[in-house]
């Protein structure tokens, strides 16, 4: 933890930002990875190659991890990928998993607009339990420094199986 705090202090002093805690991704202001922004902002994306994932807003698919199966499938037209249709709860859980780890966090307005008020109520309820680990401002929830150490636990608490 000492190393984490030292690095965080150093980067902040240089006016860099830690925009994704998962990989300790740090950058200068507004120089974020465009590739990763698509995941974090729940945008559509296409993955090409073995193990690549794609998302079209409704379904998620992923290619086989085996190179020879992928190449053979592409060349012959055989299936080399799996597809799953996401329900609302699964889309919400993906949103939590990707956004909570970023500097932008969970946005109440986005949640209300894309998932409904029942999800907003559940997020509010769980947020109270972890208020010592979260920062709540501008209708957004982000992790404070202590919260970053238990990010997985907090994210799993927000996961919803069914709110109805």
Where do the PLM segments sit?
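Short, amphipathic alpha-helical interaction segments positioned at domain boundaries
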Residues: 148-164
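C-terminal scaffold of the Radical SAM
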Residues: 1-117, 163
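A short, conserved structural fragment
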Residues: 131-139
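Basic, amphipathic "hinge/linker" alpha-helix immediately C-terminal to the N-terminal HTH DNA-binding motif
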Residues: 143-147
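Short amphipathic alpha-helical interaction segments
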Residues: 116-129
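Self-splicing inteins and homing endonuclease
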Residues: 29-31, 139-142
């Amino acid at each position: 933890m000492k190393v984490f705090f030292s690095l965080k202090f150093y980067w902040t002093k240089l006016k860099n930002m830690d925009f994704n805690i998962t990989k300790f991704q740090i950058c200068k202001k507004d120089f974020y990875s465009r590739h990763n922004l698509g995941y974090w902002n729940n945008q559509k994306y296409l993955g090409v190659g073995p193990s690549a994932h794609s998302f079209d807003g409704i379904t998620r698919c992923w290619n086989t991890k085996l190179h020879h199966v992928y190449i053979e499938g592409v060349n012959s037209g055989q299936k080399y990928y799996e597809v799953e249709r996401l329900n609302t709860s699964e889309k919400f859980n993906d949103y939590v998993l990707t956004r909570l780890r970023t500097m932008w966090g969970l946005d109440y307005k986005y949640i209300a607009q894309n998932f409904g008020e029942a999800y907003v109520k559940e997020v509010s309820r769980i947020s109270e339990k972890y208020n010592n680990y979260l920062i709540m401002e501008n209708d957004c929830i982000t992790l404070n420094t202590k919260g970053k150490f238990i990010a997985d636990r907090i994210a799993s608490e927000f996961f919803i199986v069914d709110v109805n």
